[in-house]
């Protein structure tokens, strides 16, 4: 789906041809077209699993399209060419019939001109893949991923279930799965730990899980606590030097608590 550049080689072949009663030089011009697919460069594929993502946000724009081999490797089944002008509602309405109304739970959707490839394995959603503008959690999480890794390819999964985690785990090209949800207060109840264990142990993914937005111990959190997951908490900024965590306690890694996110 990438527009491949064409290198045109002009070969001039001069041949003397003997014609009846005279000699003439005939110039033969042969055009040879060689297609060269530009390299993607160094990258990693990160799979945020969250509420949805605002694919219309300027933060996710990309002035190129991904190469066919990458899209085929991720199992893309559908392309949505997004409307680029107007409010979120105006653009959604313009693309509704051709895109959002026809996406199914088995589709993997690529939006050319963005960094986003997305899927919604759960059917219980009003608009597949898209984030509710009044929510924005998945959009913000993905923005933080790109702040840390500007060259990341985003394989976004909408949902909070084992099926959502496994949709990312089953992708051979996905490197990292990141989740930022769970029970309030890190109540030690079953969550997605079975699916993240499969993702890490069986499929060799890296899983990072956010701690709860309280000082509750991260080790008991179903997302951040398992030994195969990397638990992330937030710390107070400025001169705190990570001494005061604001989101979970006893994490594996403390990250900055406040960022300017989309």
Residue ranges, per PLM feature:
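Substrate-binding/access-modulating region of protease and related hydrolase catalytic domains
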Residues: 133-140, 153-231, 239-241
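Active-site core segment of subtilase-fold serine proteases
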Residues: 36-144, 152, 172, 230, ...
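Short glycine-rich anion-binding loops that position phosphate/pyrophosphate groups of nucleotides
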Residues: 52, 64, 182-184, 213, ...
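Extracellular/periplasmic catalytic domains that process cell-envelope and extracellular macromolecules
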Residues: 38-42, 147-149, 170-172, 199-202, ...
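Secretory targeting signatures
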Residues: 1-36
């Amino acid at each position: 789906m990438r527009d491949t550049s064409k290198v045109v080689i002009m070969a001039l072949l001069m041949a003397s041809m003997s014609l009846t009663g005279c000699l003439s030089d005939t110039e033969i011009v042969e055009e040879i077209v060689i297609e060269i697919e530009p390299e993607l460069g160094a990258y990693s594929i990160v799979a945020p699993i969250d509420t949805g993502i605002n694919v219309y946000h300027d933060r996710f724009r990309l002035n190129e399209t991904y190469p066919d081999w990458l899209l085929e490797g991720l199992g893309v089944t559908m392309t949505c060419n997004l409307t680029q002008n107007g409010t979120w509602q105006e653009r959604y309405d313009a693309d509704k019939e051709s895109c959002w109304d026809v996406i199914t739970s088995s589709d993997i959707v690529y939006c050319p001109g963005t960094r986003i490839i997305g899927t919604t394995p759960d059917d219980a959603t009003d608009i597949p893949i898209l984030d509710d503008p009044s929510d924005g959690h998945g959009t913000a999480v993905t923005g933080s991923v790109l702040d840390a890794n500007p060259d990341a390819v985003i394989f976004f999964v909408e949902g909070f279930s084992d099926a959502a985690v496994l949709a990312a785990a089953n992708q051979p090209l996905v490197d990292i799965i990141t989740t930022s949800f769970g029970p309030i207060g890190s109540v030690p109840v079953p969550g997605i730990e079975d699916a993240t264990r499969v993702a890490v142990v069986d499929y060799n993914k890296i899983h990072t899980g956010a701690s709860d937005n309280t000082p509750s111990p991260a080790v008991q959190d179903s997302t951040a606590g398992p030994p195969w997951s990397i638990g992330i908490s937030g710390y107070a900024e400025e001169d705190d030097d990570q001494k005061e965590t604001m989101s979970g306690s006893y994490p594996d890694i403390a990250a900055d608590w406040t960022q300017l996110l989309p």
